Amino acid sequence: MQKTPFHLVEYSPWPLLVSLSLTSMPLGLIYYIRFGSIYLLLYGMLLTSIIAYMWWRDIVREATYQGHHTTYVVKGLKLGMALFILSEVCFFFAFFWAYFHSSLAPSIEIGSVWPPIGITVLNVFQVPLLNTSVLLLSGVSITWAHHALTEGKYYSTLSGLFFTVLLGVYFLMLQYGEYNETSFSIADGVYGSTFFMATGFHGLHVMVGTLFLFVNLVRTYYYHFSTTHHVGFLAAAWYWHFVDVVWLFLYISIYWWGS
């Protein structure tokens, strides 16, 4: 019988192993930049991915099959996810600060105009608008899946999650095509730097969110969630809505106002 409402974690090899694998990643990046060999970086990424899978597998077992995630543990997980999203807000705030700092008072080096001379901006009513529609629709579908889960509608939950994952993949494909069509690169001054840093990191978050939702899709298929206990699903939904909101700010500030 457990004496406290908190999960007292047992000894695990994963924290030590993941610290070693994470150490090899920046070392591999430095080695790649200096000598052009990418093998150490790929090794670190592969090893980190495997360890993360094994660690999260243990967490799923503890939560789903062993009942270690009590009400207090769930509250802590929700608070942790909320603080993580808050840190991500600060992360993107830095990119928006850099963009508006450069655009509201453009320097003489870029012609004192924004967008800078020589930059052909993307049409705001083409792929960017389609991307906005895709993400807004995905926000509707994940909300539909969440409501279906709380009401015990198994197949509706699966359908909503599957549709959201498809929209996430479609968004990434559109973003990749948009990058191939741009007439500027990340090396083309402050506009290219801020554009690709902000939209690129958002694309990375969409990729992570899509993987997060896919894991929840698999877990839903295997009946890991109930109408009252689905903190993993809730965390994925929060993260996806955060990605949606960030894109709206990107679309309004960079694609529409910045053009």
Swiss-Prot record:
GO molecular function, one term: cytochrome-c oxidase activity
Subunit structure as annotated in this protein's UniProt entry: Component of the cytochrome c oxidase (complex IV, CIV), a multisubunit enzyme composed of a catalytic core of 3 subunits and several supernumerary subunits. The complex exists as a monomer or a dimer and forms supercomplexes (SCs) in the inner mitochondrial membrane with ubiquinol-cytochrome c oxidoreductase (cytochrome b-c1 complex, complex III, CIII).
EC nos: 7.1.1.9
Protein location: Mitochondrion inner membrane
Protein's organism: Albinaria caerulea (Land snail)
Membrane protein topology class: Multi-pass membrane protein
Cellular component aspect of the GO annotation: mitochondrial inner membrane
One Pfam family cited in the UniProt record for this chain: COX3
GO biological process, one term: mitochondrial electron transport, cytochrome c to oxygen
Reaction equations catalysed: 4 Fe(II)-[cytochrome c] + O2 + 8 H(+)(in) = 4 Fe(III)-[cytochrome c] + 2 H2O + 4 H(+)(out)
Transmembrane segments: 13-33, 35-55, 80-100, 119-141, 154-174, 195-215, 232-252
Domain of life: Eukaryota
Family membership noted in the UniProt record: Belongs to the cytochrome c oxidase subunit 3 family.
Identification of the protein by name: Cytochrome c oxidase subunit 3
Function according to Swiss-Prot or TrEMBL: Component of the cytochrome c oxidase, the last enzyme in the mitochondrial electron transport chain which drives oxidative phosphorylation. The respiratory chain contains 3 multisubunit complexes succinate dehydrogenase (complex II, CII), ubiquinol-cytochrome c oxidoreductase (cytochrome b-c1 complex, complex III, CIII) and cytochrome c oxidase (complex IV, CIV), that cooperate to transfer electrons derived from NADH and succinate to molecular oxygen, creating an electrochemical gradient over the inner membrane that drives transmembrane transport and the ATP synthase.
Keyword presence, Methyltransferase: no
Main enzyme class: translocase
